[in-house]
Amino acid sequence: MRLALAQINTTVGDLDGNRARILARLIPALGATPEPAPSEETRLFFEAVARLAPALSTVRALARHLRVRPSTLMSRFHRAGIPSPKTYLAGMRLLHTAFLFQNPGLSVSDVAYRMDYSSPQSFGRHLRAVLGVTAGEFRRRFPFDVALARYIDLLITPYREALRAFHPFNAGSWDQGPSAVAVSRAG
């Protein structure tokens, strides 16, 4: 039991270090000086996704943590012409998976459960649906650095300009929560 707890604690600490490695490459890929830097909100979105991805698998749960309605979040991404928040979340979960697979002592089942899948079979179905590969193939073909480069190449670089100007949390009068002033409708 003590060994199992030590492995879990090590994995949690490792995922924190992994988050730092992801952000160290992802944030500069969004753009830096002399180009306009990404909006603070865009940076915060990616920091939140990197932090929350191992435990969250739905946009609804992500939106709850970000204190934005899921439909509002998805609408903002669509209007900005960038991939959906689900795409960014699913990709980030795959990055964390690739990181865990670097540990030869972790089985596919271990990784599936640590990434909060209900079963190794569910995890395998997800990999096959998203990438068309088995968990074993994913482990061999997508080591962490390859997976991170692919994430940046597919989800950041083509949308760099839109992401720099993007404001995913820009709350309007409709989604500021229960403390917002009521909107009156003349009529």
List PLM regions with ranges.
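Hydrophobic structural segments
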Residues: 1-29, 37
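Linker/hinge segments immediately adjacent to helix-turn-helix/homeobox DNA-binding domains
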Residues: 20, 27-43, 53, 57-60, ...
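Basic, amphipathic alpha-helical hairpins
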Residues: 30-34, 44-58, 77, 81, ...
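Short, leucine-enriched amphipathic alpha-helices that occur as contiguous helical runs
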Residues: 38-46, 90-94
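Basic/polar phosphate-binding segments, predominantly the helix-turn-helix DNA-binding elements
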Residues: 56-88, 112-137
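Terminal helix-turn-helix DNA-binding modules in bacterial transcription factors
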Residues: 79-118, 141-170
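Helix-turn-helix/homeodomain-like alpha-helical modules used for DNA recognition
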Residues: 121-131, 135-136, 152-187
